[in-house]
Amino acid sequence: MPKFKTHRASAKRFKKTASGALKRGHAYTSHRFHGKTKKQRRQLRKSALVSHSDMKRIRQMLSQMK
């Protein structure tokens, strides 16, 4: 039986919180800010939590992450 490996691309994008939830960054933050309002840009800077519907799939990819 082979060892399970952490999906490295996912490990770089998600961080586990103390309560076990997963933090993620927002999309649409690399360029083209002139089309976004100040409020949108400010809100995109903050991190968000992964939704419960995606949690199982992402936890499988991060199975070996501490």
Swiss-Prot record:
Matches recorded under Gene3D superfamilies: 4.10.410.60
Annotated region described as Disordered, given as residue ranges: 1-66
Keywords, sorted A to Z: Ribonucleoprotein, Ribosomal protein
Record has Ribosomal protein as a keyword: yes
Record keyword Secreted present: no
Regions of compositional bias (Basic residues) in chain numbering: 1-16, 23-45
InterPro entries associated with the record: Ribosomal_bL35 (IPR001706), Ribosomal_bL35-like (IPR021137), Ribosomal_bL35_CS (IPR018265), Ribosomal_bL35_sf (IPR037229)
Cross-referenced Pfam families: Ribosomal_L35p
A GO MF label: structural constituent of ribosome
GO biological process: translation
Listed SUPFAM superfamilies: L35p-like
GO cellular component entries: cytosolic large ribosomal subunit
NCBIfam families named in the record: rpmI_bact
Assigned protein family: Belongs to the bacterial ribosomal protein bL35 family.
HAMAP family reported in the protein's UniProt record: Ribosomal_bL35
Protein name per Swiss-Prot or TrEMBL: Large ribosomal subunit protein bL35
Native source species: Lacticaseibacillus paracasei (strain ATCC 334 / BCRC 17002 / CCUG 31169 / CIP 107868 / KCTC 3260 / NRRL B-441)
